[in-house]
Amino acid sequence: MDLLTLWNLEREEVLKIIEDAEYFKKNRCGHDILKNKSIALIFESPSTRTRMSFDLAVHELGGHSLMMNEGEIHLGKKESIADTARVMSRFVDAIVARVKSHKTLEDLAEYGSVPVINALCDLAHPCQILADLLTMKENGKDFKGLKLAYFGDGNNVSNSLMIAGAILGMDVVIATPRSYEPSGLFVKKALEIIAKYGEGSLTLTDDPEIAAKDADVLYTDVWISMNDKNKNLEEILKIFPKFQINAELLSKAKEDAIVLHCLPANRGFEITDEVIDGKQSKVFDQAENRLHAQKSVLKYIFEH
């Protein structure tokens, strides 16, 4: 089974992945789920948390990881992605790929014969969001009816948050400047999932105060995302500051609200030092939870 986006998962499957992640967090070592298995880790862009957490996850589950960075592998350059996928499938038991284009993941999954896990692409960041859900749960947040407010650029993280929120019955509010909204495809998918379960809601707004009001979770990410170097920096610095998570915005949320950021953070831009280092910030627990959630994902794909 592949994990390219979250929308192919049922609610029970997401909850089971989170439950298993909790188990792995409490019982970090002594597992052999990946015994005699080799996992390819493909990275087209630099990474700290994703690379460390997946490499450790494979090792701590008893497997072997094979790291390949851009420039060390033919991935659509001098060889088709289809041929690369076919060859890699002869050597490894699964492919974890952090790539620039979602199409690369689709091609790896289509032409390869082993499971493919999306470790991040331009459209989605499913493994990050599973770690976020673990962080919410361990901070006493019930998913059903939870108000999750996202602030900033409508990027891969916001796309995947919408899907996860829809699956679990959350009330998700995405606050972005106009013309920086999340993917229309992901909005459509989220609304379809909400209709399927008959629970939850999705709201898009350009008013951060509406999003923050009585929120249980406040979430932000960098204003210039992967592959967005062509964005107008001057325009961003003009229209994005009102979407910053700061003490004033946080005061509009519930008293026990938590703050999340997938990191790396541009402190002083999308989030202030005061907030990210404050008592309501769970950012570094969230970063650690990448390891535990990704162990659970690896377990899941080899069981299905």
UniProtKB/Swiss-Prot annotation:
It is found in: Cytoplasm. Its EC number is 2.1.3.3. Coiled coil: none annotated. It catalyses: carbamoyl phosphate + L-ornithine = L-citrulline + phosphate + H(+). It holds the Pfam family OTCace_N. The keyword Transferase applies. L-ornithine binds at N156, D221, S225, M226. It comes from the Archaea. The keyword Amino-acid biosynthesis applies. GO terms for biological process: arginine biosynthetic process via ornithine; citrulline biosynthetic process; L-arginine biosynthetic process. It is an enzyme of class 2 (transferase). Carbamoyl phosphate binds at S47, T48, R49, T50, R98, H125, P126, C127, Q128, C262, L263, R290. InterPro entries: Asp/Orn_carbamoyltranf_P-bd, Asp/Orn_carbamoylTrfase, Asp/Orn_carbamoylTrfase_sf, Asp_carbamoyltransf_Asp/Orn-bd, Orn/put_carbamltrans, OTCase_ArgI. Keywords: Amino-acid biosynthesis, Arginine biosynthesis, Cytoplasm, Transferase. Pathway: Amino-acid biosynthesis; L-arginine biosynthesis; L-arginine from L-ornithine and carbamoyl phosphate: step 1/3. One of its GO terms (cellular component) is cytoplasm. Its main location: cytoplasm. GO terms for molecular function: amino acid binding; ornithine carbamoyltransferase activity. Reversibly catalyzes the transfer of the carbamoyl group from carbamoyl phosphate (CP) to the N(epsilon) atom of ornithine (ORN) to produce L-citrulline. NCBIfam families: orni_carb_tr, PRK00779.1. Belongs to the aspartate/ornithine carbamoyltransferase superfamily. OTCase family. This is Ornithine carbamoyltransferase. It comes from Methanococcus maripaludis (strain C5 / ATCC BAA-1333).
